[in-house]
Amino acid sequence: MATLFVENLTVADFSYLHPKRGMVGESWLVDLELTGDLDHQGMVFDFGHIKKRIKQIIDDSVDHRLLVPVDSEHATVSERDNNTSLEWLYRGGTIRMVAPSESLLLMNGPEISKANLTLFLMDLVQQVVPDNVAEVRIVLREEDTGTAPFYHYSHGLKKHDGNCQRIAHGHRSGIHIFENGRRSRYWEKLWADRWEDIYLGTEEDLEGTYYIEEIPHHRFRYDAPQGHFELVIPEDHCYLVDTDTTVEQLAGHIAEQLAAEAPGKHFRVRAFEGIGKGAIAEAGENMPGKTHSGWLSGAAVI
């Protein structure tokens, strides 16, 4: 038998529910190995088919969804007419969500982990590979950012035509901040702490704030092409902006906030959206009241 491998086959950008942290945005790289007999072409499986079939099935099942461990004592889930209602009780408060069922992945087990998601994906992939493939191996891993700060955020983009419109999906994202041309770990750490396990909400989508068990919670709701979305989440796990939460606008927001917090200085922000892609914005002394945003992309598969 022979084994072929594909590193960085795709990036799974999603959010999941945690009993202590609440809603957590995540980005995991997916590596794949297939072991089996060679076919008539002398291959285990054509690389072109891997990208078409296997990448697609992984993206369709996990990417831009909220992963829910339905066997957890923290979860209450019901489904009706292609919509799912969810309540998640955790240390920080209560998360409630109503959304089209396709925007969630309900997983067996008491928690979401690399181990159980890996098994889930291997079972899916096994269904689409040819009979000569005897073994499927998948590795899920975070991007290696060294000591550079990063944050986990969740959000939804109601105006997006694709799956970004889903109200609870997320990313694990790095941030690079340059103050007067020099990289500043101080500001990077400040924003990484500020947006740790955060939900980034648009003020326009905020219906109101009310108390559950004496804890203030925000309620967001909107209609999008895929259907109606509602989310209730503790106020102190939210950060509100007056724009949509696209990475271009988030980069601009961070740059403008930095310029306001440190007058007289110039800032350049590279804000990532998951792995290998993001936006650049500048603000400060050389361009008062303005930001310049642009898209950045790395070598990772997106």
Where are these regions (language model features)?
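Charge-rich, low-complexity N-terminal segments
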Residues: 1-302
